Structure formats: C-alpha cells, structure tokens
Regions:
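Sec-dependent signal peptide recognition
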Residues: 1-6
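Hydrophobic h-region of N-terminal signal peptides that target proteins for export
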Residues: 7-16
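N-terminal maturation segment of proteins
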Residues: 15-239
C-alpha cells in the first residue's frame, strides 16, 4: 500500500494540455485524496491537515468499502485509451493498473481476517508516532486525541478477528504467541513503562514547562482510562 501511495504522489508531477491526459491526472488526484483518507496516519506524516486524530477504518464495513473502491477504480482505468495519453501517462496507466490488479488479487484471499502480525498491527500502534511530526504542543495534543480514538480501532480489530475464527482463518500459533506478548506489554498497569508514554517523557524545550506538565497529565489519564483497558480487552480475547 505504501508503494501505491508513493506512486500516486510522484505521478502528479506530470502535466498535459490534452483532455485525456488531464482526465487521467484528475483521476489520479482523486485516488490520491482517497488514499490519504484511508491512511490518516500517513497523511499526517506527509503534512496533510485534517487527519490528525484519526486511525484507518479497520471495520468490516470499511474494509468492504475499500475493496469496492479498488474494483471501481479498476473499471475506470480500463476506460482510458493509452494511445491518447502522452508517454509519461502511458507508463503511469500501466503501473497503476498493475498495482490495482494486484490489490484486487490480494483481496480474494481475505487477508483482513488475519488482523494480527507480530511485525505490525494494533498491538504496535504506539510505533505510529515515529513517523509523525512532534514539534509543538499542538502536535502532542493531536497525538493524545488520536490515542483517545484507539479504543474503536481495537474493538473493530477484535470483531474482525472473531469473524476470521468463525470462518476458520487461523494464524500459526507461534506467531500469535508473539503478538500476545506484545499485547501484554500494552496492558500493564504501570503507566510510566507503557510504550505510549515514552514519547511524553522528554518533550521539546520550546514547549513551556507548565504546558509540558499538562500534556503529561493528559497523556497519563488517556493511557490509564482508554489505552490500558482497551488492550486488556484485547488480551482477554487472546486468552
């Protein structure tokens, strides 16, 4: 998916006065905006405003809507005549069509029913902050607000995982044991040792001390009342 985002980003450098080229570039721009909406953490990392408190919609409905969008995009791609595009956009069309076909092929395997991976997943959500700009008090407030919405993502993950089990989609036990250990780290009651609190231990000196205290207080409250209970639910699900 990151390859798709990168492709869309660099594609906007192409331009043409020919109608077909303009239509194609307009299509790519719409796809780019859609991708940003689907990947709000990435959007924030790219400096795009308006997604600062959001997580990807990992609900079953959200997943199905994405699959439908990719299918619709593939249909739209087929409408473009390569011979009416300049050489740059001919290449862009081939590449984006190939990426879309690959996404469609992958969706046939229902990989979303395996929502856990020891190298990524909701149990490692704290790692998202590594790609985000954290320079001002506002940046930290946005991150706290995003954390307050993490419970919904965890609940949706459990719901999708439960559906996967009902359909007999099971990941290797050895991998899930690693995931379980990662979850237990998040559900520990010691806030100071919680992975989500690490980023608040040393705040930029440009943030006034009183504001630093307020940010840490809000972070501890959020971790205690929102993060730890949500991961405890996830831990119980794994049991």
């Amino acid at each position: 998916q990151s390859l798709l985002l990168f492709f869309l980003f660099i594609s906007f450098t192409a331009s043409s006065s020919i109608d077909e080229n303009e239509k194609f570039l307009s299509f790519l721009e719409k796809e780019w905006q859609w991708e940003l909406a689907q990947n709000p953490v990435y959007a924030t990392a790219m400096g795009v405003k308006g997604f600062e408190t959001q997580w990807p919609d990992n609900s079953l409905k959200g997943i199905k809507l994405r699959e439908a969008h990719i299918q619709d995009s593939f249909v739209e791609l087929k409408k473009f005549d390569p011979n009416s595009l300049n050489k740059t956009n001919q290449l862009n069309l081939r590449l984006y069509t190939q990426l879309t076909q690959t996404a469609l092929s992958i969706s046939e395997y229902n990989r979303y029913l395996f929502p856990f991976n020891h190298r990524g997943g909701v149990q490692l959500a704290h790692e998202a902050v590594e790609s985000l700009p954290l320079n001002t008090a506002e940046d930290y407030r946005f991150w706290i607000e995003r954390l307050k919405n993490l419970d919904k993502r965890i609940e949706r993950t459990i719901s999708v995982a439960r559906l996967g089990l009902e359909k007999n989609y099971k990941a290797p036990r050895v991998l899930m044991e690693r995931v379980y250990r990662q979850i237990k780290i998040q559900s520990k009651q010691n806030i100071e040792d919680n992975p989500f609190y690490k980023v608040f231990k040393e705040l930029p000196s440009t943030i006034p001390l009183e504001e630093q205290k307020a940010l840490r207080k809000d972070a501890r409250k959020t971790i205690k009342e929102e993060i730890i209970p949500s991961y405890k639910l996830l831990e119980d699900f794994f049991k």
